[in-house]
Amino acid sequence: MSPALPLDPIETASRDELAALQLERLKWSLNHAYENSPVYRRKFDEAGIHPSELKTLADLARFPFTTKKDLRDSYPFGMFAVPQERVSRIHASSGTTGKPTVVGYTARDIDTWANLVARSIRAAGAKPGDKVHVSYGYGLFTGGLGAHYGAERAGLTVIPFGGGQTEKQVQLIQDFRPDIIMVTPSYMLSIADELERQGIDPATCSLRIGIFGAEPWTNDMRQAIERRMGIDAVDIYGLSEVMGPGVASECVETKDGPTIWEDHFYPEIIDPETGEVLPDGELGELVFTSLTKEALPIIRYRTRDLTRLLPGSARTMRRMEKITGRSDDMMIVRGVNVFPTQIEELLLKQHALAPHYQIVLTKEGPLDVLTLNVEPCPESAPDATALSAAKQALAYDIKALIGVSAVVNVLPVNGIERSVGKARRVVDKRKSGQ
């Protein structure tokens, strides 16, 4: 068996060594943003703070937040901090409304990104000679190219498939026999469905490791994927505004939440309502400051992702708890805060039902109605009695454990539209009156 790929030396540095590096790089990043981005200069001046006032890492809390709105208001290149001729690549995330969020990279930024995704792939257990099947979308989305260049930087063979064409994906997985797949967890389930449709047991295919990201997914989902595919499933975290995939990633030996690559990104957890910085271990909104980015430095960027910071385990760098949801993904149903991942956890306990689901929110007069569309599990082939029992049990659990009533509809197999990227888990029709 080939040995695992070696770690970067910084991954085993002491906390004191890491903190010293973070402070040095943080001072550079704040100065770079202030001196070269008019948007940041204005924000800092309005807040009455200057980069020279940062003496300790804790002083970062005195600086203003950056939000997605800031990026959209400066569309397309208003927050860039280098001349256009130094921008080597542009990516963008579309969002649901309005103009896309545009991010830029210098050649050095792209080099750093490739190194961090390579580090993430090594942390997942990659070995020399491994082949990586990339099913993230290519193009303006950061997933495909981020995974691609990271796998190449790690010295691995890349199969640059991209999203969609599930039958073709399965054919190439069978023919090319990749060891690693990088994809959204929801699309991994679609690939597993297609393998089974073709009469192939997913656990017999060549894949050894799945590196899953771009959408929240639960530990119950991890166990379901691992059981079905016969692989190690690890979580990679990132967002285009901060860099793309590879901001943090799980280590295969622990699978206890993504390790944040703290030599390039400084994390904070804040109270999403007050903006107050919370101590490690408390649940709140994740905030990132880039320490080395040139084209688009990010200062205290509010990700809207909800998690908590935890001590390092497989590495000395801190971990983040698996994302439980986003503050802007939260549904308020009859006054109760509900996250899709809560419903997912309950669904996965019903073995007669598949892990595919969609939540539809409507109004019945003044009252909210939550409808949960699910499918039978093809593997267990439940009869009508088993499906009825699972449906009733799921509705009971949602009411008992989350506190809202749900109408559970069992659709035919493949009755829920499959996504080649991020799954559309929630359809809110309340405002439209549909």
Give residue spans per PLM region.
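Nucleotide 5′-phosphate-binding alpha/beta core
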Residues: 1-92, 97-115, 119-123, 127, ...
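Active-site phosphate/ATP/adenylate-binding loop shared across adenylate-forming ligases
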Residues: 2-8, 63-234, 242, 246-252, ...
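Short, flexible turn/loop "capping" segments at secondary-structure junctions
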Residues: 10, 203, 259, 322-326
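Generic structural signal for residues in well-ordered beta-strands
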Residues: 158, 233, 267, 357-359, ...
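Conserved beta-strand termini and adjacent loop/short-helix elements that scaffold enzyme active sites
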Residues: 161, 236-238, 270, 362, ...
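AMP-binding/adenylate-forming catalytic core of the ANL superfamily
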Residues: 181, 287, 291-402, 421
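Conserved AMP-binding/adenylate-forming
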Residues: 208, 217-312
